[in-house]
């Protein structure tokens, strides 16, 4: 806990600030008690995006709940049907062989009394890539994507619980048939399942997840600004080239995606 009071060089002083506090994250990979989670061997090379789920119960009053998560690949995490955070392409691009960044989220308000579900979507990101213009897959950092997460819950009665049960993770596939940093996504909306991360929802064709190899590099908390949606730009001009191709001009350089 900390509080602040300021004195000037003219002996004037401010009022005392309100008491505040901070939380210490997982300082070293040895602090992570959970295992890395991945798909089973037969799905290892599939370009489809797996949707992982883990069900757990909360039966006492909570005073805090924090999710710590990172991945070899990029992830999007959900709890009880709601997306966690607003960052995109987490955990970001680092030299995965040496260092991976993790993120921490306050998820106390997302938890329910009784049954709960945490869900994780996992894509290749910068970690590995399927290049559509070649027959063979090019591996950038590794052949198998995976994630690690730890949900730490503190209860009013003084107990602390870590949701790390790797045996309870399962996965199936959804509408995203492939996802690439360089080649975009292929999506079949006929396969969309908007309730996949709802507690109690039965996902069809679920498979038991597998424990992945441990990460040998350094796991560090995010040091940089996260990638987020900043603004929406309207198209300025539709250009038709001599060959008949249509080019949409937004009037400036940008990094983002197109919505029709």
Regions found by a protein language model. Give the residues of each.
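CBM-like, beta-strand-rich accessory domains located in the C-terminal region of large
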Residues: 178-203, 207, 212
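Accessory beta-strand-rich segments of carbohydrate-active enzymes
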Residues: 1-3, 8-10, 21-28, 42, ...
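Tight coil/turn sites that cap or link beta-strands
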Residues: 61, 114, 241-244, 251-253
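Predominantly extracellular/luminal regions of secreted and cell-surface proteins
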Residues: 22-33, 198-225
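Edge strands and adjacent loops of beta-rich recognition modules
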Residues: 44-49, 209-250
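Short, solvent-exposed loop/edge segments of extracellular or virion-exposed proteins
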Residues: 35-43
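Short, exposed coil/turn segments at beta-strand boundaries within extracellular/luminal domains
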Residues: 11-16
